[in-house]
């Protein structure tokens, strides 16, 4: 058999590379793919060709695709998000080569990449861009496919795609758009359930995930009752599946408590947070970051109620939270946040001296490393307390320290630095005015005394 010209032999590899370049994926991601697509000729290949055998150029990309799909799960399980995302890009490029750009499996790979950008990288803009590109192809194949097996996969992919779009819109503070797309995910999930005789176990986006996302989108639209209904459903589903004491309920109780607080239903919010706290203690022990956070949330819920009978509970749970964080040697930011929340409550309840003492002892401990933002806030709060008490000198000293840290952390032109500087300048003018007034009075008093003495002597 006559040997093919060199240009023809290399054209397959060049075509494969051209496809990858059309996707908009960075060029460096395609380097390895070119070598996998390009069927480099060896003496053995030549022998096969001479024997009348044809080399299947797609066999190598198919093998690479299977390997890449396996690697994705391995990287995700190992919490290697960036590597997993790179493999998703590789899968998409290989799917274009193996199936063609208009095939639903290629659109599925692109939808998977979009979901990866959302869940692995936290990049909603990129997630939306890729999901929108994949949508039309998947919808066309959904209408035209006759295979139940393919339709099930397409429906599952559409659930994932619309969920990705919904959550991406939600992260960009567009509640209505988020809700519309999540409803589409819900409709496709219902269709998948019917086609699968009610069994949808093991799909990537679960019913619970979708229900929670719908609840959050409802909350973003300020539809409190609807949000409440979704979270109640999510809680019921989790309890039916895993019981009353599963740690999965903690975040759900905390979120539904937030909704109840917005509805001014403080007693119900407190009940939910008490349940979250109890599960934290039983699941993680009393000295754990989860329990410390739950304790702080419960303290704030008691404080938000404004009820005098909860005053002791506020102190108890704030002190538990702070003590737990300090025992664990937790992140300085978390400890300072709990202390500042407690001090805010103390100030609101007229205990400025106690708040000041606590803030001062916190700073004097010197265990807060590089938490510049929180330390600056602490100095600001202490300065505000001193100002409220009429101690201008102490307030100026504390606000000066706050401004110094803010200028280092944010820069002197940042709004926080500018606001602190304005307040500091105002206090300094007041102190100067007070000093001048005092001196004037003293001088005036001295002159009056001299006149009185002279009069008496005469």
From Swiss-Prot:
Claim: tRNA processing is one of the keywords in the record: no
Alphabetically ordered keywords of this record: Coiled coil, Cytoplasm, Cytoskeleton
Coiled-coil region: 175-198, 246-278
InterPro entries noted in UniProt: TPR-like_helical_dom_sf (IPR011990), TPR_rpt (IPR019734), TTC23/TTC23L (IPR042621)
UniProt superkingdom: Eukaryota
Disulfide cysteine pairs (residue numbers): none
Locations listed in the record: Cytoplasm, Cytoskeleton, Microtubule organizing center, Centrosome; Cytoplasm, Cytoskeleton, Spindle; Midbody
GO cellular component: centrosome; cytoplasm; midbody; spindle
Stated name of the protein: Tetratricopeptide repeat protein 23-like
Name of the gene: Ttc23l
